[in-house]
Amino acid sequence: FPIHIKLDTGMHRLGFQENNLPELIKTLQGNEAVKVKSILSHMATSDDLAHKEFAISQIELFEKLSSQLMAELKIKPIRHILNTSGISNYPEAQYDMVRLGIGLYGVSNDDEEQKYLENVGTLKSVISQIRTIEKGESVGYGRRFMAERQTKVATIPIGYADGISRHLGNGVGYVIINQKKAIILGSVCMDMLMVDVTDIECKEGNTVIIFGERPTVSEIAKLLQTIPYEILTSISQRVKRIFYRE
């Protein structure tokens, strides 16, 4: 059976530590039932150059431990330690392969690098209904949006059950309708959210961009003080996926 050995070089989440190696080697020596296909580790700070010294220490420990395993077990497996940020910041540690994760989706943790990347995914919805409310009227649960003028409101059938954070409500987040920004009004509901389209020419059935070229996943992450990974992985399974091939 093929197996993959993960080494804990400082992340302290999963893997064999240095003091585990003698027992691991003893267990594997002469065991013909398994074959080591790869040795890997994971970097804790590859995206943060303020911790470059720690990152380098992880790479050095990985080199030491993986080399020890290879020598004592007389094997030549694939070795890998770098994720997306590691590929950019520590190219000298690419070994036999790298793990391009969020980079596959056109997202980088580096603002300068991001200029050369495009988001590969777009989250879309449509306008379900448009209504006009008067000054003093409210929108949504808790009346958290109170109109200060006559306001045209569009309802979009997507909400926090689909992965849209409630923290984007009350004017924090926005969507794009016909190339224009529409601010989210009041609270994001479970299955719907409402936006201000007072100054936007639009009609029911028009496409709504939740994220894509604008706003990007990274921009939404900054609004929520989180990371792009969380935005992407929060999109629930009930959201239909459409894949395009070139």
Which functions belong to the PLM regions below?
Residues 4, 93, 172-176:
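Amphipathic repeat-derived elements
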Residues 7-9, 84, 158, 213:
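Residues immediately flanking
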Residues 132-246:
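C-terminal accessory subdomain/extension
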Residues 1-2, 9-126, 133-134:
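Active-site loop/helix belt of alpha/beta enzymes
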